[in-house]
């Protein structure tokens, strides 16, 4: 009885995976990636520079913390 329930569980999992593969299509377009790419050109250089400076400051802080 235990083997039958394990077999049924495995078959059910495989059916779910097969259904997910069958419902996927490449004709959906860019999806979320297309929306991100469209808004990336709207970023200002000042914002990018501020983010770069923030990352640089955090990296320097991490290096200072690692010194013995």
UniProtKB/Swiss-Prot annotation:
Location(s), subcellular: Secreted
A single GO BP: neuropeptide signaling pathway
Modified residues (Pyrrolidone carboxylic acid): 21
Major subcellular location class: secreted
Pfam families referenced in this protein's UniProt entry, alphabetically: Adipokin_hormo
Keywords for this protein: Amidation, Cleavage on pair of basic residues, Hormone, Neuropeptide, Pyrrolidone carboxylic acid, Secreted, Signal
GO molecular function: hormone activity
Modified sites of kind Glycine amide: 30
One GO cellular component term noted in the UniProt record for this chain: extracellular region
Tissue expression per record: Expressed in antennal lobe (AL), corpora cardiaca (CC), corpora allata (CA) and gnathal ganglion (GNG) (at protein level). Expression in CC and CA detected in all animals, expression in GNG in some animals and in AL in few animals (at protein level).
Signal sequence coordinates: 1-20
Propeptide: 34-68
Organism superkingdom: Eukaryota
Family: Belongs to the AKH/HRTH/RPCH family.
Function comment: This hormone, released from cells in the corpora cardiaca, causes release of diglycerides from the fat body and stimulation of muscles to use these diglycerides as an energy source during energy-demanding processes.
Protein name: Adipokinetic prohormone type 1
